[in-house]
Amino acid sequence: VICPPFYCDHGHGIRLGEHVFVNANCTFLDGGYITIGAHTLIGPNVQIYTPHHPVDYITRREPKEYAYPVTIGEDCWIGGGAILCPGVKIGHRCIIGAGSVVTKDIPDNSVAVGNPAKVIRKVD
């Protein structure tokens, strides 16, 4: 289920597993693939970014965009307002706290919160 409004760049780069729920007002920039595992819940206002731009300002002037895939495992819960940055992998059975900014991979069975998101505990 995807609740409107929903925003994406292309749509063809988004892969959803069975029984995925995407709440309202989410933005998925899918220049690279976005893969969301089965039974995952995405809260409202979540943003998933695959595009990455060079840090060097001269290179950034070139009309190029690089994209790195974002992967979310099965049975995850991504809290409202979370931001997932290019190239991150979130393992299976993870919880990402509301408003968190995920800049690095999160291992299976983790609860991660904050900006940048850090693992604060494991879940069974």
Where are these regions (language model features)?
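Extended beta-solenoid/beta-helix repeat architectures
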Residues: K89-G91, I106
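Acidic, glycine-centered active-site loop in nucleotide-sugar glycosyltransferases
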Residues: P107-D108, V113-P116
